[in-house]
């Protein structure tokens, strides 16, 4: 009761099994599905956390077919980031073009399903609708501002965000440092704020985006100084999302 579980499940199955293997080298897709179905049968709430690699982003239709077939109620696609200290994973890194192409295709499929009353909840779409309807930012980085999350490792080491769990960004240790000091640590604020790319200064979405999450700059947003994947996605999706937000406001407005 009052517990939300996260299920790490990459889509489609070939993408999951290529990178999520057990100690014997076997893919784990089937085992994760078994665990997810156990949660469903028990009536326990869960979200699916799906890593958006370059391979997954190239297959938006296959990803959405899997979402439908598995009857996933809530899903969050997390961009596969370029490595801070793990170059062996660079080959799976998402690109801004891949981000935009994937989300535009998934948005069309999601909107079509929504018109028929059967759309899965996609976190990015939900977050944008909430932002447009209320002005409230519910996701760290969505408006370009970092909010310390204080990730705590088993040895007590504290980091400002799960995207920055490396020695360079270690804020301190929960066993020895006061919580307020950890929240004020430079790595939890100033170090995560990068200067905005020059393309942002003339972008019509600047007030909505604020430059976005600095850690996702090269995967979701900028390629050089001439293209932004997030702006490309918003060009297509924002009119529909704005309409949904307006309809939601009308429905919730007191008589």
Per-region residue spans from a language model:
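Flexible glycine/acidic-rich beta-alpha junction loops that bind and position SAM and/or redox cofactors
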Residues: 14-19, 74-97, 120-133, 159, ...
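C-terminal accessory region of radical SAM enzymes
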Residues: 97-132, 163-204, 210
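Short, small/polar residue-rich loop motifs at catalytic or cofactor-binding pockets
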Residues: 143-146
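Short, basic/aromatic recognition patches
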Residues: 131-141
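Radical SAM enzyme core and accessory elements
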Residues: 117, 155-157, 166-169, 195-255
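Conserved, mostly hydrophobic/aromatic
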Residues: 7, 106, 156
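Radical SAM/AdoMet-radical enzyme domain recognition
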Residues: 1-80
